[in-house]
A protein has these predicted regions:
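N-terminal alpha/beta PP-like core and its mobile active-site loop of ThDP/TPP-dependent enzymes
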Residues: 2-176
Length: 176
């Protein structure tokens, strides 16, 4: 039996402060039962590190950041964590190739029914110089697949790409 958080409404993640999207994402993960985020760093993922450090400083809920060296190892660690602890775990990996590196562990997660939130980075979509966080370097133009979710879609209950109009805390709480 998988441990789930019982809540009266989906807005329970709003019990904590959030100045940035990342603050809401890490709070929603922790409040949804995720104690560990198995993390493979990438240029588009530094916000996880910043948000978790900020949460720890301000006494807000956030999962423990477990730095990993490879995406396949990260997903397998999350699977083991979910199996042993009987609660959800999460991974965050580099855009495109990082998602591909999850490999056959995606099949294991799906067929075993293990509660793992798999997140991948994405390049900025705003034109360079148009706003904070807009595209900058050339690599951001070539590492973005047309549909990154397609890589894992057959082996997941749900996939969602956060867009500017989304409420990130609400989306993470729904995904969990």
């Amino acid at each position: 039996m998988i441990h789930t958080q019982e809540r009266g409404t989906e807005a329970w993640w709003m019990e904590t402060g959030a100045e940035e999207w990342a603050d809401a994402i890490v709070a929603a993960m922790k409040l949804g039962g995720v104690d560990n985020l198995f993390f493979v760093s990438g240029s588009e993922l530094s916000f996880y590190q910043e948000a978790i450090a900020k949460a720890q400083t301000k006494g807000r809920p956030a999962p423990h950041l477990v730095t990993m060296t490879h995406e396949h190892v990260a997903l397998n660690a999350a699977l083991g964590n979910a199996m042993v602890r009987n609660q959800p775990a999460a991974t965050a990996v580099h855009v495109d190739v990082g998602t591909l590196h999850y490999g056959a562990a995606i099949h294991t997660a799906w067929r075993g029914g293990y509660p793992v939130l798999m997140m991948a980075g994405t390049g900025p979509r705003a034109f360079p110089g148009s706003m904070r966080g807009a595209r900058g370097g050339g690599v951001q133009w070539v590492q973005e697949p047309r549909d990154q979710g397609e890589i894992v879609r057959q082996y997941t209950k749900l996939d969602h790409r956060l867009e500017h109009q989304d409420n990130p805390g609400l989306m993470i709480s729904r995904l969990l």
